Amino acid sequence: MSDTEYLARAEAVLAAVERTVDVANDGDHDIDLERNGSVLTLTFENGSKIIVNLQPPMKEVWIAAKAGGFHYRFIDGEWRDTRTGTEFFSALTEYATQQAGLPITFSA
């Protein structure tokens, strides 16, 4: 994948996360979302955080959550964990739901 393709696909991930948080905040959630360049920080009501950031040199998207640090690479049309193969949005849904204490579903 070229650098241009990576940036387009990775920025789409960040945009999808931002959209989901905006919709969740219209409902029962109160998630603070801060974007600084290619880093998104989600802060939940209990003070816990999830950080999603782009890693252009490696062509990856990373998640840092209470559950740990995870690296995702674009494989066969989806962002997949480099160790487990778990799909990015499925994993983020699990981590955010655990940390928020309320269900929240992320998708592309």
From Swiss-Prot:
Alphabetically ordered keywords of this record: Iron, Metal-binding
GO terms for MF: ferric iron binding; ferrous iron binding
Source organism per UniProt: Burkholderia cenocepacia (strain HI2424)
InterPro entries: CyaY, Frataxin/CyaY, Frataxin/CyaY_sf, Frataxin_CS
Function: Involved in iron-sulfur (Fe-S) cluster assembly. May act as a regulator of Fe-S biogenesis.
PANTHER family (UniProt xref): FRATAXIN, FRATAXIN, MITOCHONDRIAL
GO cellular component: cytosol
Biological process annotations from GO: iron-sulfur cluster assembly
Family recorded in the similarity comment: Belongs to the frataxin family.
Taxonomic superkingdom: Bacteria
Name recorded for this polypeptide: Iron-sulfur cluster assembly protein CyaY
Classification via SMART domains: Frataxin_Cyay
